[in-house]
A protein has these predicted regions:
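Aromatic-rich carbohydrate-recognition surfaces in CAZymes
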Residues: 144-181, 210, 214, 222-225, ...
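Sequence-pattern detector for short linear motifs
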Residues: 5-6, 55, 239
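Short, solvent-exposed loop/turn elements at beta->coil junctions and helix N-caps
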Residues: 235
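Bacterial Sec-dependent N-terminal signal peptides
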Residues: 1-23
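Extracellular/oxidizing-compartment recognition motifs
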Residues: 22-232, 260, 281-285, 319
Length: 332
């Protein structure tokens, strides 16, 4: 009985939190939150494996003074003792956002896994990140944003994963603690996720090569930021800002055309406006939809109006525009 009471209390706490987060100014805020949830995208998943082993090379001409150089095949990870390869760097070939999974195996027969193994995984977007010490950390933002994870594995063989979502291209693996037995990776994969699939845009044959490259990078960056909302960034500050909604929705309208994601963000921001009907500049999805309280900016509130107008222009969805019209008027 006690167990069921605790579950009921938890459900009520969640319900009260969500209700408290919603605006009391608009009578339809609860409906707006439901409409936002109905537009939540289904992810496109794709599994990736490391392509090559690389090493960091100092290069004054390279971005941030570092570049990567190919040094070997990833097969050694699965056939040789990982203890021989502590500090190895893997290149997955492209920037990815998602989850990392792996499994370990013992090398040899009749060998006991007699002690735990401790591994450190450092995920980096660019070579310079792997070559800049994380500690001591002088930054004002949370140190926990940096993507270094230490995992202790009590037995081998074992399957494991990094518990948080990651954004990276390069992965460095250090062996921090091990016993006398040899072990290697049995499997390793990264499951990338996005609300959209990769596309190729048809540009004019006369398009400058630099513009083509900028367009390619822009498309990829947008894809990585299109998760369950238009994120400010898939690695850090994973939340929805009004200005990011405006900019990313504009780019999406001419590329991926996932207008439901734009609609979701418009409704989510409206549902979580403050009790005076004014929009918060930024909102969060987890653990439940809620705003960054006190984060009000007139410029951002007005940008919301422009974002809704652009959405109407590209979709012709008058129903949504009329539904959110009271929010537009209130910001002015």
């Amino acid at each position: 009985m006690k167990k069921y009471l605790l579950i009921l209390m938890g459900v009520l706490n969640v319900y009260s939190f969500v209700c408290f987060a919603q605006s009391k100014y608009y009578e339809h805020s609860n409906d707006w939150l439901k409409k936002s949830e109905a537009c939540k995208p289904a992810f496109v998943y794709k599994k990736h494996s490391p392509l090559r082993i690389v090493k960091s090379v100092k290069d004054e001409k390279a971005y941030q003074g570092w570049r990567m150089e190919d040094v070997g095949n990833v097969d050694v990870l699965f056939n040789e003792s990982l203890k021989k390869h502590s500090g190895i760097i893997l290149d997955f070939g492209e920037h990815l956002t998602g989850t990392f999974n792996f499994s370990l195996k013992i090398l040899g027969e009749h060998i006991a896994s007699d002690a735990p193994i401790r591994l450190k995984f450092t995920f980096a977007e660019v070579p310079g990140e792997l070559n800049t010490p994380f500690d001591p950390y002088p930054g004002g933002l949370s140190r926990a944003w940096l993507q270094d994870e230490i995992i202790t594995l009590m037995t081998v063989p074992i399957e494991a994963s990094i518990p948080r979502r990651l954004s990276f291209r390069y992965l460095k693996i250090d062996v921090l603690g091990a016993s006398s037995f040899d072990f290697a990776f049995d499997k390793m994969s990264f499951t990338a996720q996005s609300a959209v699939e990769k596309i190729e845009m048809d540009l004019a044959t006369t398009t400058d090569p630099l513009i083509r490259k900028i367009n390619e990078v822009g498309l990829y960056t947008l894809k990585e930021c299109m998760q369950t909302v238009y994120e400010d960034g898939p690695k850090r500050d994973r939340r929805l800002w009004i200005a990011d909604l405006y900019l990313e929705a504009l780019a999406n309208a001419y590329s991926y055309k996932n207008h439901d994601l734009t609609k979701r963000c418009l409704y989510l921001l409206a549902a979580l406006s403050n009790d005076e009907g004014l929009l918060h500049a930024t909102v969060f999805e987890e653990p439940h939809p809620h705003p960054q309280y006190g984060q009000y900016c007139l410029d951002y509130a007005l940008i919301y109006n422009v974002a809704l107008l652009e959405y109407l222009k590209v979709t012709g969805d008058k129903e949504t525009a009329e539904d959110l019209w009271p929010v537009v008027v209130r910001q002015i």
